[in-house]
Regions:
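N-terminal secretory signal peptides that target proteins for export/translocation
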Residues: 1-20
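Intrinsic disorder/low-complexity segments enriched in polar/small residues
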Residues: 12, 20-22, 44, 335
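Scaffold/interface architecture of coatomer-like assemblies
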Residues: 41-335
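Bacterial N-terminal signal peptides
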Residues: 23-37
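Low-complexity, intrinsically disordered/propeptide-like segments
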Residues: 9-14, 37-38, 68
């Protein structure tokens, strides 16, 4: 006697229930993917980064009153993406401390002594909230002649003629990296600014190469240390007979550093300037017209250096901002 075949079909009611559950699961998955991918939704704290930068805003017309600039006048992009301005305040309070290092190439020609009166007048004019020190580029290091101090007499005791030996600084970019890594203060709230007096020629890369590894290391170290770097061109011993190509290469390398950090390079042609006084006067004006920018941007987890572009809509102004900034995860942002 043959038995009836076993019916593998599922009752219609049960099949209907499965379809409902499957549809529900599919909808949930689709919504989850949509929310995760949609750019309009706010980032989590782990996806946000924060950073700070020193920005200089000057009136285009010399002698004009300082411009009135608010955070609404700014457009900031970090790594090519729009960033949100979280703070914008001028450094105009006596509590806004400034730390300044004059970093002099020890291979500079001894005629630099003719600029000492201008340097002394500049240091003596600095306000009480400014601590200054003088360091010399020697064998790839920044060698301080005294401590950071608001006492002008203490600072100027460290001013002396450079050694004037060809190549004694090694590379000026080694020395800047060393200064950035061993900044002589732990005050994270102070502005940190550097004035390099050098020809900028890297003896290990005599040509202009923006990818010079020593240059790029100096820029990265300066950005991490939040330095604003300026340079005053002054020829070194052994480089006086350098070709115009090599001198121009040195100036161009210095410009790479100053533009990346929000500073400025000063030079007049290929020779030494007659006087530092106009350059130092502009530095004083810049220190008086600086702002602290705070921003929030996207970040892929770990602290990293990002490119930054800042535009200012205030008419009659010019702005210098760093081309690179350090961005930290929002939850552990560095001050």
């Amino acid at each position: 006697m043959s038995s009836a075949p076993f019916d593998l079909r599922v009752p219609a009611a049960r099949r209907s229930g499965w379809r409902v559950k499957s549809a529900s699961i599919a909808i949930c998955v689709a919504v989850t993917v949509l929310f995760a991918a949609a750019p309009g939704f706010s980032q989590s704290e782990s996806e946000q980064g924060q950073g700070r930068a020193v920005v200089t805003v000057l009136p285009k017309q010399e002698g004009a009153l300082p411009p009135s600039v608010t955070g609404q006048d700014l457009s900031v992009k970090v790594n090519g993406k729009q960033a949100r301005v979280t703070s914008w305040k001028p450094f105009q309070s006596p509590e806004n401390s400034l730390e300044l290092v004059l970093l002099i190439d020890d291979s500079a020609r001894s005629a630099l002594g003719g600029q000492f009166d201008s340097i002394k007048s500049f240091v003596k004019s600095l306000p009480p909230n400014t601590k200054t020190a003088i360091a010399y580029m020697q064998n790839g290091s920044a060698i301080f002649s005294g401590p950071l101090s608001a006492d002008h007499a203490v600072v100027l005791r460290g001013l002396h003629l450079p050694g004037g030996f060809p190549g004694s600084s090694a590379s000026p970019y080694f020395c800047l990296s060393d200064l950035a890594k061993h900044w002589p203060s732990a005050d994270r709230e102070a502005r940190r600014e550097v004035v390099m007096v050098t020809d900028g020629i890297d003896p290990y890369h005599m040509e202009y190469d923006p990818d010079d590894p020593y240059l790029q290391a100096a820029i990265a170290d300066s950005v991490r240390a939040r330095l604003v770097v300026y340079s005053i061109y002054w020829q070194g011993m052994g480089n006086a007979s350098s070709s115009s190509y090599e001198n121009n290469a040195g100036q161009s390398l210095l410009a790479e550093v100053t533009e990346a950090t929000g500073g400025k390079s000063f030079w007049i042609g290929m020779g030494n300037p007659v006087s530092f006084q106009p350059f130092l006067a502009e530095l004083t004006r810049r220190f008086r017209n600086q702002y602290e920018l705070g921003f929030v941007s996207s970040l892929n987890g770990k602290p990293q250096i990002e490119s930054m572009k800042l535009k200012l809509s205030t008419p009659g102004t010019e702005v210098d901002s760093p081309g690179q900034v350090m961005v930290y995860p929002a939850a552990s942002a560095q001050k």
